Amino acid sequence: MLPEQQQHLISLLARAVAGILPEASPDILLERPKVAAHGDVATNVAMQLAKPAKRNPRELAQGIVDALLADPQARAIVDSAEIAGPGFINLRFTAQARQAVVAAVSAQGAAFGRAARRDEKVLVEFVSANPTGPLHVGHARQAALGDAICRLFDASGWDVTREFYYNDAGNQIQNLAISVQARARGIGPDAPEWPADGYKGDYIADIARDYLAQASVQAADGEPVQASGNIDDLEDIRAFAVAYLRREQDLDLQAFGLKFDNFFLESSLYTSGRVERTVETLIAKGHTYEQDGALWLRTTELGTGDDKDRVMRKSEGGYTYFVPDVAYHLAKWERGFHHAINIQGSDHHGTVARVRAGLQGLEEGIPKEFPAYVLHKMVKVMRGGEEVKISKRAGSYVTMRDLIEWVGRDAVRYFLIQRRADTEFVFDIDLALSKSDENPVYYIQYAHARICSMIASSGLDDATIAAADAARLTAPSEFALMQRLAEFPNVVKLAAQELAPHHIAFWLRDCASDFHGWYNAERVLVDDEGLKQARLRLAATTRQVLANGLALLGVTALERM
């Protein structure tokens, strides 16, 4: 049911309860029964109140039902009610209540499922790869999840900023530079003098070739970097290689249809003095101590659940990796982002408590749950029943660009979103390429394209279809489809609240299934002109909501296939 219908029904149930138990203050929840034959919605309010009221739950449920059905306002929504099991109340809607979604979608169009704007902003950080190689399938999952979460928050009225954090300071950048230098000197990955921690992908040879050619490269947010071609200048090689790979990652993101609002460089935390100031503040606040020549943070005393204190500055003088993370998240807070979400691999699980502890130690009034985290598990790529592990381009892993070239951007986005982030996922290339009902992307996009074709072949214009009488829509499969469409705004709300875009993917698959079921059960282009127009209006309504849902995942609503 529509959100406004849901709130109205909850208020009607509360009024019915108040007539029986004036002192009660129930938390009334409505759910869709797992079995459609049991009704349109169900509530356990009678079971919730029975014990404190010292009443039999079924008798109390009957009293609530009697009071509800005696209310004229309720009869406009509720057609019938029954008591099930220990005291569940199952409700069935009137035809008019079920048909209301058609008018709602006609009025709201692309805004159906979207909330009013709110004066709140959120920063979502995701992908955040080291500039040491092409983006891999794990980054692709982050890109799909992160962009969908951004779209969900935008639909929920938030001001959303997408941010990419470049880990451009550390040993991995040095390893990149010496790898390119070795290639420039004609040393291959199989040679005994190849660096022990060197990167071996073909892209290293490409960087070396362009460096020797004194090429110029520029990342999306940076200044052009001109190669000198001097193979002895490791710093020049490093700067060129980082810029080269940042540009390559920009191209990967462009192919994915993803544009970031801001790029933040880890190196800037050091050059600006943020890391030093963060450490000095933690020392001044009394949350550190020295032991064995190292500086430790008392994370176990800062209330974020860390199980042991953590080294901040090693005995040889370098900072551990979580220290710049604390400085970075303080920078987020100071930029006015009091809501922040990080999309990262599950291997970052151990950093959550220590980063939050560091932020608590700064005593800036930052909430303990800042930032929020979505930690995803990795992806296994399968083709022909075998795991695909190697990419010629990357040398040791399948890249984001590989996936896009193999199956297309839409399939990559949907497949990487359709499971909970915290579950392992097998990306089946053969399934993603198949034109069958088993392929969810094909199944959903085909539903949208079929509706476009149906409406075009009807010869009716949009105005005629929009004016059709939805009261003619009374077939069981039509009621089922309309109920599914009415759920969409609440699914969007749930997906945003739980940072879980897979709810949208599930809903799209279910909606496509309901549409195909209706299409197969009821002829649309019938001789009865009024019924034909009403069914075309339902089809157009379905097309609009499917398009709205696909847009939240960044997937194309195809008009023909």
From Swiss-Prot:
One Gene Ontology biological process: arginyl-tRNA aminoacylation
Segments carrying motif 'HIGH' region: 129-139
Catalysed transformations (reactions): tRNA(Arg) + L-arginine + ATP = L-arginyl-tRNA(Arg) + AMP + diphosphate
InterPro entries documented for this protein: aa-tRNA-synth_I_CS, Arg-tRNA-ligase, Arg-tRNA-synth_N, Arg-tRNA-synth_N_sf, ArgRS_core, DALR_anticod-bd, Rossmann-like_a/b/a_fold, tRNAsynth_Ia_anticodon-bd
Pfam families xref list: Arg_tRNA_synt_N (PF03485), DALR_1 (PF05746), tRNA-synt_1d (PF00750)
Principal location class: cytoplasm
GO cellular component terms, A-Z: cytoplasm
PROSITE patterns (alphabetical): AA_TRNA_LIGASE_I
Keywords associated with the record: Aminoacyl-tRNA synthetase, ATP-binding, Cytoplasm, Ligase, Nucleotide-binding, Protein biosynthesis
E.C. code: 6.1.1.19
Keyword hit for Cytoplasm: yes
Domain of life per record: Bacteria
Localization (cell): Cytoplasm
Key word Nucleotide-binding present: yes
Alphabetized GO MF terms: arginine-tRNA ligase activity; ATP binding
Subunit structure: Monomer.
Family: Belongs to the class-I aminoacyl-tRNA synthetase family.
Name this polypeptide is given: Arginine--tRNA ligase
Originating organism: Bordetella avium (strain 197N)
